[in-house]
Amino acid sequence: MTAAASDDAVYNKVADILRQCEDFHRLSTHIERFEREQASLNMHVKTELEKHVEAVELGKLALHDAQTKRVKLLQELHNMLTLCESAREMVDEFPLISRMSRIYKNCYATKQMISQLNNLVKETDVIEDMLREDLELDSDMPNLLRAHYKLSKLREFREEALYQASLEGQSDLPITLENSFSNLNTLSDNFDRLVLNFCRNIFQLVKSGHIKTIVQIFKIVEAEESSDEVLKSIRDAKSSLPDSQDGPFLSLQGMTRQLRNFRLRVLEEFQGAAAENFQRAWVSYLEDGSGELNLDFIFEDLKVAFYVLPDLTPPSYNIAKTFASIYQECLVGLVTKAVSLDTPAAVYLYLINFHREYRKFFEENAPFSVDEVEPGLEDGKDGILVREYTRLFTQKIREWSDKLFQSSVDTFMKRESEPELDSDGNYGLQGTIIFFQMITQQINIISHTNNSDVVGIVLSSIMYIMQSMQDQWKSVMRSELSQQLSGNPESVPPGLMEYLLAVANDNLKCAGFMDNTLLNTFELITSEREEDLREAFGKTVDGYILISDIGVSQIVAIISNDVKPALTSLFQPNWYQSSNMKLIVDTFRDYIVDCIEHMVPGLFDVFLLEASNALTISYLRSIFNKNACFDGDNAIQQIRSDIALAIRVFGEYMAAEHLRSTFEPIEKLLLGMLDADVETVSEYFHLLKEAYWDAPLSLVEAVLQNRTDLEKSIIKKMIDIVRHENDSLQIDTSQQPTVFSQVTSLSGSSIL
């Protein structure tokens, strides 16, 4: 191909692509949409940037304004110092005047101090009388604010006096003053304790109606805090000047005062009172024989904090959130303590329920969300409460179930007496009843929590334990049956059939218990977990039904093993004179009678179907008996007689249509192949394969080969016809297996 031709091919291909691609027609639409979205995004970003720049500018202006005021204040203080220095220079006798002024001030201050010292005892007595009168009357403490005012003045006097004494340089003077102020110190401490005690019992004050007392308390706290703020401001300003220029601050009121941090002390009282209440509740739980924890006081106190206290306290205190934080911190601490100790699962469940009520309480009463309060709660699906409860629950359920399972297995293996009988006369194991009573009780408890995380994890744990027990039961049942069928039954305790019947009954009941007990709790599960739990639920129910079916199958295996010796005589020469079929069906009848008395009704129908199928399979297997022979019409007559015996026994309990379908394989195979000749064998074989697609060719050949009413050449020809017919058949092997899939030669495995 030339280069020009190659280029033309490429151009044509590109043109074809451009002509066929529909996206190019919509390209302009996409561009317009992207441009609109970009314009919208740019506008949004621009608006947000403008807001951010505006906020930054306002912040810079505020900082600049504060800096300007600070510089101005320092300048004014510097000017004052300059004026003082200038005054000294302008007036020749200024030092003398200043000295005389200080002497006068000192004399006046000394006179005032002496007067106050003389009146100190009287003043303290007045304050004590005021407080005593209020306390004795159990009133709203009308004198509390006045007493605080007087006491504050006395404290200022004390601080000033002690400060002045420290400047004199006499070591004994401060000690003397301290002794003089001993009564004042005691009164001051008692007053503080009184106010702090009121704060500690603030909820009791509300309940008793002492609202005015609470208002006065917070007025006192606010006054103390205000004095602390003034002192901090003075100290901050003083610290910004050289030591040589701090003289003017010494005369400022409050400079000699000590920080009292009253707001912090009040907060500590709130915390201490809450901690005491929580500790009291915990101790009461430990000492209470019922073992119940009660935290209802939290709701009572927080309701007061949310509705009453905000109107009685300064807004800056944010009293509602303060108490919410205090109580939530105590609640988290209580949970931590419970986890660190050997706490019963019931307490964890109570705490989980309480947290749900706690959140609901906040939604209905608090002016803020519970998630805004620190520290955060531990009630989420990954929180410590759910983890510990589910861990402890699973551990306890595992311990209880292991004990019950081991007890049931011991009873099952020893078989020292008959199984337990329920009110309907059905066999069962006591451990199963106790286990589901325990599970039902626990499910009822967790259902009341309405906590989907707890319910989901607990249900998952329960079903895991159930599935584990199912696996263990399968192993135990398989082992016991193997010993029973090993050929030495004398070494095995009797009664295996009865106990298999009990296990089958119990597991069918368990499937029903699952529907009645666990299924109702799924409405509490979140949709994200429901699918997995329903899958586990279905698997667990199927497991119980499977064990019940295994129990029935193993009972049938025991029956089949009992009749095995009698089956070996079928189709033998003496079978035509005396068939063992009556002995075989009588054995089945005996087992059926035992089962109908002690088997749950729904399971009995399954047992009948399996037993009749087992008889059919065993009968067909007998075709492979050694020396088996089929004498034409005589064999047909005897087979019909055998089938009639079986129908007579099973017909007492099964419907006619079930009986016909059960024994039809014998008729289709034996009666068909025994009645067939060279002309009809193909038709009989075709009818057999139509009804039972998996009927083995070896079984058909065995019947034909053992016919004694035909010559060997004819039999060989019939076998060739059957083989040819079998090869020509188009069979769908994806169909459900029939009873013939279980019919094997004597060397095959037995039905268990």
Swiss-Prot record:
Keywords: Cytoplasm, Cytoskeleton, Exocytosis, Nucleus, Protein transport, Transport. GO terms for cellular component: cell cortex of cell tip; cell cortex of growing cell tip; cell division site; cell tip; cortical dynamic polarity patch; exocyst; lateral cell cortex; nucleus. One of its GO terms (biological process) is exocytosis. One of its GO terms (molecular function) is SNARE binding. It is found in: Nucleus; Cell tip; Cytoplasm, Cytoskeleton, Spindle pole. Gene3D superfamilies: 1.10.357.50, Exocyst complex component Sec6, C-terminal domain. Its main location: nucleus. The keyword Cytoplasm applies. InterPro entries: EXOC3/Sec6, EXOC3/Sec6_C. Belongs to the SEC6 family. The exocyst complex is composed of sec3, sec5, sec6, sec8, sec10, sec15, exo70 and exo84. Component of the exocyst complex involved in the docking of exocytic vesicles with fusion sites on the plasma membrane. This is Exocyst complex component sec6. It comes from Schizosaccharomyces pombe (strain 972 / ATCC 24843) (Fission yeast).
